[in-house]
Amino acid sequence: MSPQTETKASVGFKAGVKDYKLTYYTPEYETKDTDILAAFRVTPQPGVPPEEAGAAVAAESSTGTWTTVWTDGLTSLDRYKGRCYGIEPVPGEDNQYIAYVAYPLDLFEEGSVTNMFTSIVGNVFGFKALRALRLEDLRIPTAYVKTFAGPPHGIQVERDKLNKYGRPLLGCTIKPKLGLSAKNYGRACYECLRGGLDFTKDDENVNSQPFMRWRDRFLFCAEAIYKAQAETGEIKGHYLNATAGTCEEMLKRAVFARELGVPIIMHDYLTGGFTANTSLSHYCRDNGLLLHIHRAMHAVIDRQKNHGIHFRVLAKALRMSGGDHIHSGTVVGKLEGEREITLGFVDLLRDDFIEKDRSRGIYFTQDWVSLPGVLPVASGGIHVWHMPALTEIFGDDSVLQFGGGTLGHPWGNAPGAVANRVALEACVQARNEGRDLATEGNEIIREATKWSPELAAACEVWKEIKFEFQAMDTLDTDKDKDKKR
């Protein structure tokens, strides 16, 4: 009999139901460096105290169940249980609280995002005592980070592979996203790449449909890449979407891409799943392929402010599972993204060490212990007038991706690509000369139109296009104080 069992045997077994807070609410607990820490936004049902709600989250996402069980005596709950160690009210909300929960590291399988999420965001999200529950942030301890390989290559290795430095990379999603034949699709890629873009991209729902089978698409896109490289003298790429119905088929597509000699492939990591994504990331690392990640389905999980998982958590999970790029919103385009929140998880994707900063929605200090960084991808409803803001917001280590903002150019794809490249080069040069992109951005673009007719035409087409809707996911503030200001 183990010492743990001997300790428990003397306590005896008392059947029945008891409040979670008696066991799992421990405000005196001092967190350990090896604990996984979670910040949950908890909305209890009427009549449920916040301490009980927080304790229920800790219990149901670790060792607890709805009643006392005799097998509790066969292990040490003090060693393995999750602990709610803090509760704080959410400013401006009547019945929402941030519950802080600490999990012992031994609860989780090494190198498995799948297992981590199965525990922390599993059945507890359907718990009846909670009206709503949202995972706002995680602190991943360095001991656990070191069990993950992370991105296949990372930012610096990608720049070295592409031989491109000192500016954001430029991309384009081929449109229409569905319906083109493989040959016409490849032609669209070629026109964009020869015009000055670094990458073109499969849309997230392009897999292997009757109108364009994956092998045909891969062949014609590879032809486009090599032809554009020969003409421009620059390394080019196309995000070949390897996402498939099975992991075996996904890896078969990745192998074919490697045999073609292309530099990068793509995966839809949420619809494809973390197990598939980690497997694909390992293959890319071993075979010299960059891996672009699309976040299709993320808004189902992260858009509601009081329920689900915040994207900063999904971004951390992707950095652990593996990917060299990930879509991160634009702040200025057609998709959801509040500026400070977006900058917060962009830092979490790129930097080695990120301090706690609630003004950016970061609840915990995170040390990635040299895990490679991920390039954020700004994509969705952006065009040349957005270039100064995008360059200022995202900086050099990013990918700026213009789909309609390239292919919608009145003169065609190649002139659309030229317009974007000229606008980017103008913004980077102006920034390097000390000009303020935030205040002088429109003037910088207008100056560049004087020597680029392609840019002038693009500016004329999109001069009235704006996406002015309030973000759903915003930082918490005291609403009463805001009204008085």
Curated annotation (Swiss-Prot):
<dbReference type="InterPro" id="IPR036422">
    <property type="entry name" value="RuBisCO_lsu_N_sf"/>
</dbReference>
<dbReference type="GO" id="GO:0019253">
    <property type="term" value="P:reductive pentose-phosphate cycle"/>
</dbReference>
<feature type="binding site">
    <location>
        <position position="295"/>
    </location>
    <ligand>
        <name>substrate</name>
    </ligand>
</feature>
<feature type="binding site">
    <location>
        <position position="173"/>
    </location>
    <ligand>
        <name>substrate</name>
    </ligand>
</feature>
<feature type="binding site">
    <location>
        <position position="204"/>
    </location>
    <ligand>
        <name>Mg(2+)</name>
    </ligand>
</feature>
<dbReference type="InterPro" id="IPR020888">
    <property type="entry name" value="RuBisCO_lsuI"/>
</dbReference>
<feature type="modified residue" description="N6-carboxylysine">
    <location>
        <position position="201"/>
    </location>
</feature>
<feature type="active site" description="Proton acceptor">
    <location>
        <position position="175"/>
    </location>
</feature>
<keyword id="KW-1015">Disulfide bond</keyword>
<feature type="propeptide">
    <location>
        <begin position="1"/>
        <end position="2"/>
    </location>
</feature>
<feature type="site" description="Transition state stabilizer">
    <location>
        <position position="334"/>
    </location>
</feature>
<dbReference type="InterPro" id="IPR000685">
    <property type="entry name" value="RuBisCO_lsu_C"/>
</dbReference>
<feature type="modified residue" description="N-acetylproline">
    <location>
        <position position="3"/>
    </location>
</feature>
<keyword id="KW-0150">Chloroplast</keyword>
<keyword id="KW-0113">Calvin cycle</keyword>
<protein>
    <recommendedName>
        <fullName>Ribulose bisphosphate carboxylase large chain</fullName>
        <ecNumber>4.1.1.39</ecNumber>
    </recommendedName>
</protein>
<dbReference type="InterPro" id="IPR033966">
    <property type="entry name" value="RuBisCO"/>
</dbReference>
<dbReference type="GO" id="GO:0009853">
    <property type="term" value="P:photorespiration"/>
</dbReference>
<comment type="subunit">
    <text>Heterohexadecamer of 8 large chains and 8 small chains; disulfide-linked. The disulfide link is formed within the large subunit homodimers.</text>
</comment>
<keyword id="KW-0601">Photorespiration</keyword>
<feature type="binding site">
    <location>
        <position position="327"/>
    </location>
    <ligand>
        <name>substrate</name>
    </ligand>
</feature>
<comment type="similarity">
    <text>Belongs to the RuBisCO large chain family. Type I subfamily.</text>
</comment>
<keyword id="KW-0456">Lyase</keyword>
<dbReference type="GO" id="GO:0009507">
    <property type="term" value="C:chloroplast"/>
</dbReference>
<keyword id="KW-0007">Acetylation</keyword>
<feature type="binding site">
    <location>
        <position position="379"/>
    </location>
    <ligand>
        <name>substrate</name>
    </ligand>
</feature>
<feature type="binding site" description="in homodimeric partner">
    <location>
        <position position="123"/>
    </location>
    <ligand>
        <name>substrate</name>
    </ligand>
</feature>
<dbReference type="Pfam" id="PF02788">
    <property type="entry name" value="RuBisCO_large_N"/>
</dbReference>
<feature type="binding site" description="via carbamate group">
    <location>
        <position position="201"/>
    </location>
    <ligand>
        <name>Mg(2+)</name>
    </ligand>
</feature>
<keyword id="KW-0120">Carbon dioxide fixation</keyword>
<dbReference type="InterPro" id="IPR020878">
    <property type="entry name" value="RuBisCo_large_chain_AS"/>
</dbReference>
<keyword id="KW-0460">Magnesium</keyword>
<dbReference type="GO" id="GO:0000287">
    <property type="term" value="F:magnesium ion binding"/>
</dbReference>
<feature type="modified residue" description="N6,N6,N6-trimethyllysine">
    <location>
        <position position="14"/>
    </location>
</feature>
<dbReference type="InterPro" id="IPR036376">
    <property type="entry name" value="RuBisCO_lsu_C_sf"/>
</dbReference>
<keyword id="KW-0488">Methylation</keyword>
<keyword id="KW-0479">Metal-binding</keyword>
<feature type="active site" description="Proton acceptor">
    <location>
        <position position="294"/>
    </location>
</feature>
<dbReference type="GO" id="GO:0004497">
    <property type="term" value="F:monooxygenase activity"/>
</dbReference>
<dbReference type="GO" id="GO:0016984">
    <property type="term" value="F:ribulose-bisphosphate carboxylase activity"/>
</dbReference>
<dbReference type="Pfam" id="PF00016">
    <property type="entry name" value="RuBisCO_large"/>
</dbReference>
<feature type="binding site">
    <location>
        <position position="203"/>
    </location>
    <ligand>
        <name>Mg(2+)</name>
    </ligand>
</feature>
